[in-house]
Amino acid sequence: MTLEEKASLCSGKDFWHLKSIERLGLPEIMVCDGPHGLRKQNAENKKVGIGNSYPATCFPTAVTTACSWDRELIYKMGQALAEECLQHGVSVLLGPGV
């Protein structure tokens, strides 16, 4: 990768997408946040913050799941988050809080 290509991965295309690098066959990547689940904003909502987001599961807070000491349950939560990301075309989830 060139220095410019590396830098483009740090800054992104917009709030929610990393630029593609066609020369290397790297597709555009969508990222979303959400400490308690997936928070993907509607395409029309171009402002960061509370707005029109697609409905998604709101999982218990990180401190609550940590207090359960139930690794299997937390693993299943990760699987559910992965399924929601796949359904919404999200490649990277910036969460959950751990």
Tell me what each language-model feature is.
Residues 1-98:
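N-terminal beta-rich core of secreted/periplasmic extracellular enzymes
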